[in-house]
A protein has these predicted regions:
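Disordered, charged N-terminal biogenesis/targeting segments of membrane/secreted proteins
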Residues: 1-54
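Alpha-helical, hydrophobic structural elements that either
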Residues: 8-9, 30, 61, 75-370
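Small/flexible residues
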Residues: 38, 47-49, 63, 212, ...
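Internal signal-anchor transmembrane helix that establishes type II topology
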Residues: 47-81
Length: 370
């Protein structure tokens, strides 16, 4: 596993560029159809989705994430074979613009082939997909014809992050729900490229083999103080590629039941991978959310915390800690028996070697992983 993880790090930090290939797509139509479909496709039971409070990443814009939280049936090709109904706009895109670009799997990483789009002097290339059955990370390269455009960016921080974000959407055919965040990095301030990274958690168990559709509108500068958000470059850039990668999930040998503040938690699935940790569980309490005012009250927040703040802590052999207890994103579904199904995920702040994990705490239980 250590060798594979070293390969992940090398692939992410030393990405090679695919050859430029312009794609005319109709995904702006697909996006509109996708949002309209979701407005009428809410399930009878309440499904709640909450974003991770991740300190090291820039969250996707709230309006765009809200549109992607509950995804109606969609897709073509491989998705149709598994019973997922296609959106009409997606069918038009596939008919008139051709099928999705292929993605080959090399060293467990998905590598979209010739998947790029150029507009207004910027080429966006989908370079890599890394993931497991519950989370995925997509890495894009942004190549600027005019290097001076990047002079408007603030200096990168110690991790290479810059004060900019991508305004856009991405969904995968058949995805029932997704949440996540993104960031832009400048790994080499002397060249003409940036790296755009999307980290997402999904409610659907597996999306491998389906079609990913990215509609990226613009690259914006983060506001400072009272400054308004301004565009660095306007697109759009549309890309469509097969969602292929090797599932890197490892099952965590956690007991069937753990305790959380006096509540019984039944663990249905617990996995860890180089990209993060995921737990699906049922807890014998429900959240009482009073959303009439449009604001989250302290009582409602405490009620949500009572179902979602299950301790979720990963300790590495070198002492590093990934703590997703109160900052991770989660999906929840109320059940008629007064319990709640919760799917909680925590994407790691960096790609990790699972062989270097010493222990994992879930609820009141610590599992030795050494």
């Amino acid at each position: 596993m250590s060798k594979a993880t070293d390969e992940y790090r090398r692939e992410l930090d030393e990405l090679t560029f695919s050859s430029e290939s312009k794609h005319r797509m109709a995904n702006h139509i697909a996006e509109a159809g996708f949002i309209r479909a979701n407005l009428t496709a809410m399930p009878a039971r309440r499904r709640t989705s909450h974003l991770a409070k991740h300190p090291a990443r820039i969250a996707l814009r709230a309006a765009l994430v809200a549109a992607a939280l509950v995804i109606a049936a969609g897709g073509t090709g491989a998705a149709m074979a598994s019973g997922v109904l296609p959106l009409p706009a997606d069918l038009l895109s596939d008919i008139f613009d051709g099928p999705a670009c292929d993605t080959e799997v090399i060293n467990r990483i998905g590598r979209p082939i010739n998947t790029s789009c150029t507009n207004n002097g910027v080429t966006v290339t989908a370079d890599a997909i890394i993931g497991d059955r519950n989370m995925y990370t997509i890495v894009y390269t942004l190549t600027f014809e005019d290097r001076s455009t990047l002079d408007r960016l603030p200096a990168p921080d110690a991790n290479g992050h810059v004060g900019a974000f991508m305004d856009g959407t991405l969904y995968v055919d058949g995805e029932r729900g997704a949440q996540g965040s993104s960031h832009i990095r400048d790994l080499d301030p002397t060249d003409n490229t940036l790296q755009y990274v999307e980290q997402m958690s999904v409610e659907t168990s597996s999306l491998v083999g389906r079609t990913a559709r990215a509609h990226l509108d613009s690259i914006k500068l983060m506001p400072t103080g009272t400054d308004e958000v301004v565009n660095l470059v306007t697109g759009p850039w549309d890309l469509k590629f097969k969602f292929n990668f090797e599932d890197t999930s490892i099952d965590i040998p956690v007991p069937e039941n753990v305790d959380f503040d006096g509540a019984t938690v039944k663990i249905e699935e617990a996995t860890v991978s180089p990209v993060g940790i995921s737990v699906r569980y049922n807890i014998n309490r429900i959240a009482h959310v009073d959303g009439e005012s449009g604001k989250m009250s302290d009582r409602a927040q405490a009620s949500l915390d009572a179902i979602s703040n299950l301790p979720l802590i990963v300790i590495f052999k070198d002492g590093r800690i990934e703590n997703g207890t109160s900052r991770s994103g989660f999906f929840s579904v109320d059940r008629k028996d007064g319990t709640t199904d919760v799917h909680k995920t925590w994407p790691f702040t960096q790609i990790c070697d699972t062989d270097e994990i010493a222990s994992i705490q879930i609820g009141d239980t610590i599992i030795d992983m050494a």
